[in-house]
């Protein structure tokens, strides 16, 4: 993308078969909500996650309500690897999920990139977006911690079939902004 974007990458090795990760991905609309107690909704408006498909994610992390709609811009998949890239409708966030088969199981990579890619005005707009308008939601450490937690949850899901305990929605929504 562009060096002015903020890019966060978290990766994890999981000693589970690639087929388990592939099955998890194939059922993403349902699995997204079960993946983390902070994930509230996932809608694949076209019923799939192919390039061009419309998607909505909603999660509440530390009282911040992230409700994002966008489009899958890339979707590659074969028997050893998958890569799915999502771009928000505002074109200020890109989320990439990538999985691959390894000798000991599978590898999962979760990348979140934020900012405008437009040359010249991109830097100014990023300043306005991150420092002025969405200062609270542009908490990079909070987002990174959530990504790390998501990876730990995925490890447990794929190795033990163990999902995290749900947090009641009213508790998550208390004081959410």
Enumerate the language-model features and the residues they cover.
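Well-ordered beta-strand positions in beta-sheet-rich domains
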Residues: 9-11, 67-69, 94-96, 111
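Glycine-rich portal/gate segments that line the openings of hydrophobic small-molecule binding cavities
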Residues: 43-94, 104, 145-162, 172-176
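Beta-strand/loop substructures that line and gate deep hydrophobic ligand-binding cavities in soluble
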Residues: 87-145
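Hydrophobic ligand-binding cavity/cleft-lining segments
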Residues: 2-50, 173-177
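Short amphipathic alpha-helical segments
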Residues: 17-24, 142-146, 150
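Extended beta-strand/beta-hairpin segments
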Residues: 7, 161-168
């Amino acid at each position: 993308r562009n060096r002015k974007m903020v890019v966060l990458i978290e990766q994890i090795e999981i000693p589970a078969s690639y087929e388990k990760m592939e099955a998890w991905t194939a059922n993403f609309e349902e699995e997204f909500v079960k993946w983390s107690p902070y994930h509230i909704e996932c809608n694949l408006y076209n019923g799939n996650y192919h390039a061009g498909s419309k998607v909505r994610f909603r999660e509440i992390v530390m009282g911040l309500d992230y409700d994002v709609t966008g489009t899958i811009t890339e979707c590659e998949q074969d028997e050893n690897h998958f890569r799915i890239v999502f771009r928000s409708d505002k074109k200020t966030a890109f989320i990439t999920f990538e999985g691959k088969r390894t000798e000991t199981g599978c590898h999962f990579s979760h990348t979140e990139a934020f900012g405008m890619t437009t040359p010249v005005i991109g830097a100014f707009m990023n300043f306005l977006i991150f420092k002025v308008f969405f200062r609270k939601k542009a908490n990079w450490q909070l987002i990174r911690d959530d990504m790390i937690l998501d990876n730990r949850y995925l490890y447990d899901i794929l190795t033990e079939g163990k999902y995290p305990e749900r947090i009641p929605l009213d508790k998550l929504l208390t004081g959410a902004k």
